[in-house]
Design a protein with these regions (language model features):
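Surface-exposed, charge/polar-rich loops and edge strands
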Residues: 1-412
Length: 412
């Protein structure tokens, strides 16, 4: 029974939203953020990538950098670039990519629901990344950026969302970096707010799609504040909740520097022990067509690799995943890559860059081979989370990413 509530969002005025909004903090580095912000003092990067307020080379973990985030957040409010709503609202956020639109409800979720597993995770988190986000939440006393959650379909919410989607949005813009559309509505009607709260309370669970570190950090800050100050607004953190069947997960692919001492011919022979190997030519990139099929690019040729029966267990929620099959039977068994997080011989190409990027990195000589995977499904993610298991690393890539700066949640 997820507990959610509306909140007094802190938002840019309509005429400033495109000056303020930005990409999420974790999809670009400091140099890119500095370039995108340019001379725009209203860019949210001054809050979420505050190292750009200092000379190049300043560590993003410098205590002065965190303090700058709080100073900038205060400045944005003082200047009227961010203004807090007078009443608690829910919000509706729509994203359109390649003609497909997904609609998310912006809510406040309860930190205890994260702690007790009502909000379910499917990835491990790194303590250093948690600590970074925790410090940012603490110094700003706000959830500047939302967590990306999913829920199983709900007809009542779908009808409510459709009703708002048929009206004129408050914000409506195209993000210049990727050409995706973004729309935003305020849900202030008391009856609609009550309906949203009630329908979420009927659900069994919510699922973290993207933002595991933000969730963990928000929950830790909330727990500390509850212990020190009692209950309050800090019991909750900001999330955008999408119907699971609307979400798009793209392939998250692998490129490897060498063949672990094998010749290309010997490597293909070893692959044939567990896969049906079929050359697909050198002209166009070959996309895996179904689960348990992989695409290999080696020596200028694309290959289809189909996992043979018996190489995975359909009843094992982890072992049936293509990310696990490829890690066990190719990366580990043949190439000797045992830890995807730390091995310097492997890199990952996700999202919109596509198979052409795999080809480019191999053809350049930087990498020896590329392996493309069929995308994980949202149902697989929910099955993993429901079973209490954790996805293998580098398994999911959601697009489009949430834009930051459309609304912010203050913890007091």
């Amino acid at each position: 029974m997820p507990r959610i509530k509306p909140f007094k969002g802190v938002r840019p005025p309509v005429d400033l939203v495109e000056a303020v909004e930005s990409r999420p903090y974790d999809v670009l580095d400091s140099e890119e953020a500095r370039a995108e912000a340019g001379c725009n003092e209203k860019s949210l990067y001054h809050i979420i990538k505050p190292e750009i307020n200092f000379p190049e080379g300043t560590s993003e973990y410098d205590p002065r950098v965190y303090d700058s985030a709080a100073e900038q957040f205060a400045k944005f409010q003082k200047e009227g670039w961010l203004v807090q709503d007078e009443e608690e609202n829910y919000y509706l956020y729509a994203q359109t990519m390649n003609g497909r639109t997904q609609y998310g409800l912006v809510v406040c979720a309860h930190v205890e629901d994260y702690m007790n597993g009502v909000i379910k995770k499917h990835e491990l988190t790194r303590r250093d990344k948690e600590d970074d986000r925790m410090r940012h939440v603490s110094v700003t006393n706000a959830n500047i950026e939302p967590v990306f959650l999913a829920y199983k379909g709900n007809d009542v919410l779908q009808a409510l969302i459709a009703r708002y989607a048929a009206t004129k949005p408050l914000y409506d813009f195209i993000a210049p970096i990727d050409g995706f559309g973004h729309k935003f509505w305020v849900i202030s009607d008391a009856a609609d707010k009550a309906t949203i709260t009630e329908e979420f309370a009927k659900m069994d669970a919510l699922y973290i799609a993207d933002g595991h570190h933000r969730s963990a950090a928000a929950a830790r800050v909330g727990a500390e504040k509850i212990a020190a100050e009692g209950h309050g607004e800090h019991d909750y953190y900001m999330a955008v909740c999408f119907p699971a069947d609307q979400l798009t997960i793209l392939d998250y692919n692998r490129v490897v520097k060498d063949l672990n001492g094998l010749s290309p011919e010997a490597f293909l022979e070893k692959l044939a022990e567990n896969f049906i190997v079929e050359a697909k030519g050198s002209n166009a990139p070959y996309h895996p067509a179904e689960l348990h099929e992989f695409s290999l690019y080696l020596e200028g040729v694309w290959y289809s690799l189909k996992a043979k029966p018996g190489t995975y267990d359909e009843s094992d929620p982890i072992g049936v995943l293509d990310v696990d099959i490829s890690s066990r039977l190719i990366l580990d068994a043949i190439l000797g890559i045992k830890d995807l997080r730390s091995d310097k011989r492997i890199d990952f190409v996700g999202g919109l860059r596509g198979l052409e990027e795999l080809k480019r990195r191999v053809d350049s000589g930087e990498m020896k081979m590329a392996l493309a995977l069929y995308p994980v499904s949202m149902q697989q993610i929910m099955d993993i989370a429901d079973s209490g298991n954790i996805m293998p690393p580098k398994a999911t890539w959601f697009e489009p990413k949430l834009r930051s700066g459309l609304v912010i949640h203050k913890l007091s």
